[in-house]
Each structure stands twice: as C-alpha cells, then as structure tokens.
Amino acid sequence: MIKADNALLLEEPLLRVPYEMLRKNLKTVHKHMTQESTMVEQTLSKLQQSTQHVAAEYGEKQQEEARESLDQLISRVRGLKRKIATLKDEQNETLTTTKARVEHLNVIFDNEKETDPEKQKETEKKWLRTRLERLLTDYFLRQGFSETAKSFAQNRGITSLVDVTILDQCISVETSLRQRHSTAECLAWCSENRSFLRKTRSSLEFEVRLQHYVELVKSGRVEDALKYCQRFLSKNADIHLREIQQAAGLLAFPPGTEGSPYKDLYACERWNQLSRKFVQTFADVHGLSDGSSLLYTLSTGLSVLKTHSCRNFGAPAELPITADKDEDMDPSLTSSARPYARRSENLPSVFGSGFSIRMYGSDEIRGLDTLPVIPPRALANLSSMRRDIAMQNNLDLEESIEDDNEESEERTSGDGERDSDGAVPVEELEELPDAPPELLSAEYLARRIEEATKENTDIIPKTTLDMFNHFYPGCCTSHQLSRADACPVCSVELNSLAENLPYAHHIRSHLDADPVVLPNSRIFGRAKLMEYSHKMMKAAPNTVVDPTSFECFKIDELITAYPS
C-alpha cells in the first residue's frame, strides 16, 4: 500500500503553484488599493481645501475644476472596482483549484484509515491512475502539445489538477523567443513580474533587451539601435557594464565579418539560451518544477531498479570489442568476426529493447539503420534444428542465400572490400556452416518485411525481436524469458534518465528469484533459462543457451547474481 507521507514528497508543485498564484494575487490587490487610495485621499484633500473659501470668491472656474476632479476621482474608483472584481474572480478560481487538489491528496490519507482491504486497494488504484493522468498531461504541456493536453485533461476530468493555463502561457512566450525570434511577449511578461525579477536580481529582462538591440544591429538599423541602447541598456551599466561594452563593439563588426570576435552575440543559439532562461525564471515565479513531474517520478522508480549489473546502452554487452587494429583484437576471432569488432561500438544490441523500426505503410520502410547485425560468433551457435523450423514455415533459405550471394558479388569490388551498407560478403563465412548468412543482410530482412506487408498489412513488426519471431520462428526467446532482459534502466528510452541516478541496494531480486550471470555478463532467471534451453533449443543436459546471442555455455559457468 502506498504511504501518504511518501506520496506527498513528489506532490509539492501540486499545491505550490496555486499558493504562489494566491500570493501574487494578494500582492496585486494590495498594490492597486495602495495606489488608488493614496490618489483618492490627495484629490479629496485638495477639494476640501478649495471649498473652504468664501462662496463669493468661489467662481464658476473653480466650480468647473472641482467637478472635473470629482469625475476623475469617480472614474478611478470605478476602474479600481473592475480590477478588484477581476482579481476576485481569479482568486475564487484559484481557491476552487486548491480545494480540488487538497481533496485529491486527502484521499490517500483517508484511505489509510479504511478497514476494508478490497475497498482500500480499489481506492489506491484509482488514485494512482489519476496521478498518472496528471503526470501525462503535465508532460504533454511541457513538450508543447497544448491541445492534446487540454483535450486529455477535459476527457479525464482532471482540469483542476493540472496547470494548463500557466504552462500554456509559458509555452507561448517560449515559442515566441525560440521560433519567432520575437521579444515583445517576453518583455511584456517581464513588465508584469518586474518586482519579482528585481527582488531575485534576475538578468532576464536585460538579456532580452540586449538581444533586441543585437537584432536591430543585424538588420542595419544602427540609429535605432543606439537610441534603444541609451534608453534601456545604459541604465544597467553599474551591473552589466561588460555586456554593454561588448554590445557597443557590434557597431564596428557587422554580421558576416570574417573572424569577428562578436560572432557569439550574432549566433542564433542565443535565442535558445534566452528561451531556456525564461522557462527557468517562469518556473521560479510560479513555483513550478524545473522539469516534468513525470520524469521526476520515473527517476524515483528507476533509482530503486538501478543496480551495478545495469549496462550503459552505448556499449552493448554482446559486442564488447572496440579495437581499431587487428593486432589489438582477440586472436581467437575469425577473419569474418573482425569487421564486427571494429564496428561494435556503433551497433545496437542484437535484441536490444527499445530499438524499433517504424513502418510508414506497406510499401515503404524507414529506419533500417537501427537494424542490428548479428556477430558471427553468435550465428555459429545456431543449430541446424532452427534452420529446419524456418524451412517448415515456407522460408526458402537456400534460394535466399543464392540471392544474397549474387547481390554480394555485384556490390563487392574485386579487391574484396565490403559494400556500402557494411554487410560482410557471404564468402567470408564459409567456416561457419550453421550460420544462415541471410541474417547478416539488412536488405534481405527489409525485403521479407515488404513482401509480407504487401500480402497482409496487419503484419507490421514493431521491433527487431518481432521481426525475427515472425520470419525465424523458434530462433528467439519466449515472451516470458524476454521479459527478464527488458530492464527499464537498460532500455534506450530510460537509460539516459537513469545515468546519473544512484544505485539501489537490494538483497534479492523482484524480477527473478534465481538470477544467474552468464559468461557474457547477461543475467537471466535460472529456471526460465534452463526451461528455454532444453525445450526450445534442445540443448545438452549440462548446457544452456543465451536467448539473445544464442551462445552456448556450460551450467558450471553460471554465477549466482545478487542485485546490488
């Protein structure tokens, strides 16, 4: 069961944002009331002094001035009333949002007091589902999918639990800076929040005005640039003197000057820097988290799963050799294995989770550069039994081999160089009789996919593992066993997110109760590995087969793994 106190650790922005809005609203009301009340008191004081004169001395001119002053006073008071009414509506809306969020968080506290286990479990499941929907909406907004986020929030009924309006405003200003290269919206926002920027000594407004000055110089409007500098930049000389001096140097080095020391000021990258600085400042003003709450929540879970056995995806476990010269390689490698060793650091895992080929229709296949090339050492362990299974599924391997041989002869030059796609000629694999050479060709696999999708558009494999399961039945892992290698920390999507997280310290595995390490550093559950090796691969009694690389190992070589 989820602990309420632990859940609140990640929910600070949920209440922080409406709190900051209420605080800002209160300060705005106080500011307007102070300004207008001072003006009203001064006007009434002047009128009172003027009416103390004798009626005879109080002529028509003085009476007209008094009436005008009263009209202006009434107009200002009415304007103040409209402002206060608008701010009151915003306050009521924020209070409603705050109430809904407090009730949402209070559900898990009330659930701890529930005595019925089934009802308690159902309530917790519903709350977690709502939290996931909140996190997804927040992620959509931060990625710029505003319409998707709004539709999703309305459909799920969680509009009051997400900051759609605030983040939409942030995205609007950020887009104007990064894409349209316009400073108008950002300067307007800086004007509204000038007190906060002054209090935190933020340089955002100066940086935006400096960029506007740079754009004036780039467009050749030198006189306008000088006037703009004197009006807006020079008053910050006590803090940003060095930046102002550099800006003045732009007048002597127009854009396009070769070897200009001011090329960084002219660079378009400054717009991206400004947009990032604005987003950071906007988050500080409204109490938003720096990044997506979804990523923070994922990081919390990944830190629990991350162990020292998790690998960096940039260095595939099955292709550890990255030597550049033949003499630096393992002498046991065959000549056909050496090209793979040199290319290993650029290749994905053979069945690496996360690598996918996106299908854009049955006649066009893109993304084939992500196809893995299976190393010959792994192919050498493919038994003839798997070839028989493939042939029973109407895969004419011999004809395919002949086609690949002809294509290799046409593409390969007389000196034996490899063709442009990096495929090794089939002639180099004569020493591997059990290795189906067509598996080495990305073109062959692409051709088989295209033929299959033309016949049946429902056959659209999404991953490399799906392709091999479809075209080479029996050659891949079972669904149950493949889950053991689908570590979230090692996946392509989450590997970079987990890179800087600390390692967890566990004494037992929650994925497999009996994890073992193979000599190639892969980890599987012993029972699943034994069942797969003997039932699927027909391995010898004292032998196991790696389901990802098809390498064979003796049972004595297995080492019991401990997660931490």
Swiss-Prot record:
<feature type="zinc finger region" description="RING-Gid-type">
    <location>
        <begin position="487"/>
        <end position="549"/>
    </location>
</feature>
<feature type="compositionally biased region" description="Basic and acidic residues">
    <location>
        <begin position="410"/>
        <end position="421"/>
    </location>
</feature>
<feature type="region of interest" description="Disordered">
    <location>
        <begin position="396"/>
        <end position="422"/>
    </location>
</feature>
<dbReference type="InterPro" id="IPR044063">
    <property type="entry name" value="ZF_RING_GID"/>
</dbReference>
<comment type="similarity">
    <text>Belongs to the FYV10 family.</text>
</comment>
<dbReference type="InterPro" id="IPR006594">
    <property type="entry name" value="LisH"/>
</dbReference>
<dbReference type="InterPro" id="IPR045098">
    <property type="entry name" value="Fyv10_fam"/>
</dbReference>
<keyword id="KW-0863">Zinc-finger</keyword>
<dbReference type="GO" id="GO:0005634">
    <property type="term" value="C:nucleus"/>
</dbReference>
<keyword id="KW-0539">Nucleus</keyword>
<dbReference type="InterPro" id="IPR024964">
    <property type="entry name" value="CTLH/CRA"/>
</dbReference>
<comment type="function">
    <text>Involved in the proteasome-dependent degradation of fructose-1,6-bisphosphatase.</text>
</comment>
<dbReference type="InterPro" id="IPR006595">
    <property type="entry name" value="CTLH_C"/>
</dbReference>
<dbReference type="GO" id="GO:0043161">
    <property type="term" value="P:proteasome-mediated ubiquitin-dependent protein catabolic process"/>
</dbReference>
<keyword id="KW-0963">Cytoplasm</keyword>
<feature type="domain" description="CTLH">
    <location>
        <begin position="166"/>
        <end position="224"/>
    </location>
</feature>
<dbReference type="GO" id="GO:0034657">
    <property type="term" value="C:GID complex"/>
</dbReference>
<keyword id="KW-0479">Metal-binding</keyword>
<feature type="region of interest" description="Disordered">
    <location>
        <begin position="322"/>
        <end position="341"/>
    </location>
</feature>
<keyword id="KW-0862">Zinc</keyword>
<feature type="domain" description="LisH">
    <location>
        <begin position="128"/>
        <end position="160"/>
    </location>
</feature>
<dbReference type="GO" id="GO:0005737">
    <property type="term" value="C:cytoplasm"/>
</dbReference>
<feature type="compositionally biased region" description="Acidic residues">
    <location>
        <begin position="396"/>
        <end position="409"/>
    </location>
</feature>
<dbReference type="GO" id="GO:0008270">
    <property type="term" value="F:zinc ion binding"/>
</dbReference>
<dbReference type="GO" id="GO:0061630">
    <property type="term" value="F:ubiquitin protein ligase activity"/>
</dbReference>
<dbReference type="InterPro" id="IPR013144">
    <property type="entry name" value="CRA_dom"/>
</dbReference>
<dbReference type="Pfam" id="PF10607">
    <property type="entry name" value="CTLH"/>
</dbReference>
<dbReference type="GO" id="GO:0045721">
    <property type="term" value="P:negative regulation of gluconeogenesis"/>
</dbReference>
<protein>
    <recommendedName>
        <fullName>Protein FYV10</fullName>
    </recommendedName>
</protein>
